[in-house]
């Protein structure tokens, strides 16, 4: 059974069991700073399990793309060398949110495996938590699995409920026992059944884990022990590795032998011209193309930090393995079409992003191939020296400073260097590497404004109702919580800065790139200045600011009023951002995707995927398209609809954003996006749009800054004033300014040429005058002189003329400009055996606070102490006498 059939059969089976088939979420978790990447199928349902979100369904099934490469899930060194380690993998999963529980979950799992996938029943084993009699009885009495093939697993991780068969999301919160299903590959493969001392072998392989969240785990402050309280609505969370299941169904032992991987391994062999299809490097490359391609699909760009650096590490590891196979030019990006062929039907977004993926990989390959050969030469040389030293394998350690140099200068991620060292039985001195890294890392931290990251304030009250789309004033909002210095307080006093949570508010909390509102909260004697509005929790708004007068208490009623002028300017910029995004895609191409934005009252700053700087013509075209939309004065429409319906209607969803099942669709002009921000009523309200900056912020990421409305008027008035001042300075009309500037530039060029001619003439005359100052030392004419006003070029020209005239000579010339010393030394060819120009110039340079170098016949230097130059030059003759 092919991998594509395995996916579809899983989804179809659970659809017949009343499950809603849910699309895979991106590899970048939306609005979850605790996770680097989506690493399991349950990630997109985390808020449901925590009770902070609800879905219109109680049963779900999906095939989730996952990535484990970083943090505690960093198995990168094993990928390609074991049968089942991967960076990217697919997780088949089904979920129940307070609906069915253990019996249905296990019975359906058994039915799917034995009746649909046709796995031999006598090859399957199960494990349960040691006290989970319910699951044990379902396996043995309902399903009929022999008791000897159902293993109870206890607390095997050193603490109560710390077990392979007891799952918990965190130290406290939802948790419960789990039941794992194993497949027995047969006695010809070493290993023992689960729970036995030989369980780490490859004979018995876990294929499906069924987690039963039925308890709330909390710490008893009196006893210091954890307690388990039954949840009112138990849930089911299951996960089965698609690649492991495919290996079983296709009768192979290694995941790399399934049809999907065999196609990618063959493609890697083709591009690297490798005959041995069992080569581990081919497996590394085949694994990594999946991870890299889908990371790029989901909006990650290679960079030097965070997710971008993980992507860069994986790309460069693949390139290094290609280099190991003999590749000396870019090859990795050529595998994208093979991947699209294998996985494009299951993931249409991969096919749609094909050109962008190829472009990003090609660019990153070109960058690394510029340095990999030199870096590998240095690393191979160091490894050769370690081996030649004859040290015991356990004592072979690569200098951490060298590893850092490879990282800093040649772009070798540490784990790439460790990979190469591991192949040569050498370890890297990580402590020294870390020390070098820390020395380089900047210590200064910007004092940013107060921010409330989700979950940093201990709030347990009701959600905030937001009604700020159509009104900016609430006369009867009630205070539900107060926080000062991060702690909950019953009241706030004048002068204190803190956070106010209201039951309903017109204040927009920062989200989607739009800054939070400012304004005031007022009561009879209370005046609270709101400096910012942030989300305490996904649907709880915190008004951060300072209490000016009165005493504010929890339960008080206040009037909440948004700064209308600031909000209006912010709305103009936000609406213009949508129109600009649409125009950028039309002008530059459909590969343009939003990578970040900041919308405030002054400007909109928009980061997007694009590899080259925008041309002036492209900028003008984007401006023209946006302003045409503004002049059309089209009305803005916002409506709520299901996510799938929204996407089908043509609304653009942004990668990396987390959307619920019901979303707000904003139509403004020809733009249609999912957006929860505040916007103008009509496009004409924007007034005018102007791009004021375009730059690169990272590889493959461009940034545009733009302004709208009265900010454009102020910008144009300021520009007009500056043009007028420039015209007056050049004694021209503004309309003649370009022509006048060209004339001035021509005059400057002419004067520069005349200046060069005069300097050359001066050098010649000075050279004639200096010849007579030369002193004969053992047949060498020695001359040391200072040339006032001479630049480096004049010094060189004078030096050449003096060498011609003096024949056998050693000469030092110096000059001073802007407090800096410039030196040049020249020695004729027939004297270099006795005097070296480099030594001569350094003799002088060291006395004036500098150093230099060069060839035996010509050398240059600089210095920072011009007052010492005359004395230094005066000692040249004596120095030459000592040398000869």
Curated annotation (Swiss-Prot):
Record remark on domains: Consists of three domains; the N-terminal catalytic domain, the editing domain and the C-terminal C-Ala domain. The editing domain removes incorrectly charged amino acids, while the C-Ala domain, along with tRNA(Ala), serves as a bridge to cooperatively bring together the editing and aminoacylation centers thus stimulating deacylation of misacylated tRNAs.
Keyword set includes Transcription: no
Coiled coil feature spans: none
Keywords attached to this entry: Aminoacyl-tRNA synthetase, ATP-binding, Cytoplasm, Ligase, Metal-binding, Nucleotide-binding, Protein biosynthesis, RNA-binding, tRNA-binding, Zinc
Cofactor, how bound (note): Binds 1 zinc ion per subunit.
Domain of life: Bacteria
Similarity comment: Belongs to the class-II aminoacyl-tRNA synthetase family.
Cofactor needs: Zn(2+)
Localization: Cytoplasm
Record protein name field: Alanine--tRNA ligase
Tagged with keyword Nucleus: no
PROSITE patterns found in the cross-reference section: AA_TRNA_LIGASE_II_ALA (PS50860)
Underlying gene: alaS
Pfam families hit by this protein: DHHA1, tRNA-synt_2c, tRNA_SAD
């Amino acid at each position: 059974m092919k991998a594509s059939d395995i996916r579809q059969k899983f989804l179809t089976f659970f659809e017949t069991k009343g499950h809603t088939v849910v699309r895979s979420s991106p590899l970048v978790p939306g609005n979850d700073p605790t996770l680097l990447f989506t690493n399991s199928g349950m990630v997109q349902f985390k808020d449901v399990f925590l009770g902070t979100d609800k879905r219109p369904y109680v049963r779900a099934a999906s095939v989730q793309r996952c990535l484990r490469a970083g943090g505690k899930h960093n198995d990168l060194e094993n990928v390609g060398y074991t049968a089942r380690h991967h960076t990217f993998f697919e997780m088949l999963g089904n979920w129940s949110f307070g609906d069915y529980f253990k019996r249905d979950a296990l019975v359906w799992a058994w039915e799917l495996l034995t009746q649909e996938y046709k796995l031999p029943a006598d090859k399957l084993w199960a494990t349960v938590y040691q006290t989970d009699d319910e699951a044990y009885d379902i396996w043995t009495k309902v399903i009929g699995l022999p008791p000897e093939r159902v293993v109870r697993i206890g607390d095997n991780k050193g603490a109560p409920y710390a077990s392979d068969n007891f799952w918990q999301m965190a130290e406290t919160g939802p948790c419960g026992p789990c039941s794992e299903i194993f497949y027995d590959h047969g006695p010809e493969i070493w290993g023992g059944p689960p729970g036995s001392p030989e369980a780490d072998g490859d004979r018995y392989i876990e294929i499906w884990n069924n987690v039963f969240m039925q308890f709330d785990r909390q710490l008893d402050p009196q006893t210091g022990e954890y307690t388990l309280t039954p949840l009112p609505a138990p849930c089911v969370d299951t996960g089965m590795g698609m690649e492991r299941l495919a290996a079983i169904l296709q009768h192979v032992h290694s995941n790399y032998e399934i049809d999907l991987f065999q196609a990618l391994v063959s493609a890697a062999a083709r591009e690297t011209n490798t005959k041995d299809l069992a080569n581990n490097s081919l497996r590394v490359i085949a694994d990594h193309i999946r991870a890299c391609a889908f990371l790029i699909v989901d909006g990650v760009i290679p960079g030097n930090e965070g997710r971008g650096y993980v992507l860069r590490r994986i790309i460069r590891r693949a390139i290094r393995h290609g280099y190991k196979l003999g590749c000396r030019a870019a090859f990795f990006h050529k595998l994208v079409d093979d991947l699209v062929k294998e996985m494009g039907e299951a993931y249409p977004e991969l096919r749609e992003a094909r050109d962008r993926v190829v472009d990003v990989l090609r660019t990153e390959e070109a960058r690394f191939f510029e340095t990999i050969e030199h870096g590998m030469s240095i690393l191979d040389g160091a490894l050769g020296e370690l081996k030649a030293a004859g040290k015991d394998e356990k004592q072979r350690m690569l200098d951490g400073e060298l590893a850092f140099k490879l990282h800093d200068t040649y772009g070798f991620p540490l784990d790439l260097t460790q990979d190469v060292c591991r192949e040569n039985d050498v370890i890297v001195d990580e402590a020294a590497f870390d020390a070098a890294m820390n020395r380089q890392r900047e210590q200064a931290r910007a004092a940013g404004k107060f921010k409330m990251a989700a979950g940093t304030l201990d709030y347990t009250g009701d959600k905030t109702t937001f009604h700020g789309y159509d009104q900016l004033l609430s006369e009867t909002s009630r205070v539900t919580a107060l926080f000062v210095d991060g702690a909950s307080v019953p009241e706030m006093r004048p002068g204190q800065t803190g956070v106010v949570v209201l039951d309903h508010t017109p204040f927009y909390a920062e989200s989607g790139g739009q800054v939070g509102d400012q304004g005031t909260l007022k009561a009879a004697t209370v005046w609270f200045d709101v400096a910012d509005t942030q989300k305490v929790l996904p649907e709880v708004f915190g008004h951060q600011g300072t209490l000016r007068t009165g005493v504010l208490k929890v339960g008080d009623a206040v009037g909440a009023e948004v700064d209308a002028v600031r909000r209006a300017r912010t709305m103009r910029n936000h609406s213009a951002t949508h129109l600009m995004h649409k125009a950028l895609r039309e002008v530059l191409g459909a590969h343009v995707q939003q990578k970040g934005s900041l919308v405030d009252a002054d400007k909109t700053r928009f980061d997007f995927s694009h590899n080259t700087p925008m041309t002036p013509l492209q900028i003008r075209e984007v401006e023209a398209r946006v302003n045409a939309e503004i002049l059309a004065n089209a009305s803005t429409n916002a409506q709520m609809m299901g996510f799938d319906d929204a996407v089908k209607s043509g609304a653009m969803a942004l990668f990396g954003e987390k959307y619920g099942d019901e979303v707000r669709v904003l139509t403004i002009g020809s733009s249609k996006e999912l957006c929860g921000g505040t916007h103008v009523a009509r496009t004409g309200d924007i007034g005018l749009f102007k791009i004021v900056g375009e730059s690169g912020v990272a590889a493959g990421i461009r940034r545009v800054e733009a302004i709208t409305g009265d900010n454009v008027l102020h910008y144009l008035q300021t520009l007009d004033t500056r043009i007028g001042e420039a015209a007056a300075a050049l004694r021209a009309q503004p309309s003649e300014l370009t022509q006048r500037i060209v004339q001035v530039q021509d005059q400057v060029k002419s004067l520069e040429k005349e200046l060069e001619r005069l300097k050359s003439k001066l050098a010649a005359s000075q050279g004639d005058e200096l010849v007579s100052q030369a002193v004969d030392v053992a047949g060498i004419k020695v001359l040391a002189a200072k040339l006032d006003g001479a630049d480096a070029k004049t010094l060189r020209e004078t030096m050449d003329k003096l060498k011609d005239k003096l024949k056998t000579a050693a000469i030092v010339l110096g000059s001073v400009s802007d407090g800096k010393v410039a030196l040049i030394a020249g020695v004729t060819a027939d004297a270099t055996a006795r005097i070296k120009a480099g030594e001569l110039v350094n003799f002088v340079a060291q006395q004036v606070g500098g150093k230099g170098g060069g060839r035996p016949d010509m050398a240059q230097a600089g210095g920072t102490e011009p007052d010492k130059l005359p004395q230094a030059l005066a000692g040249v003759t004596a120095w030459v006498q000592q040398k000869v």
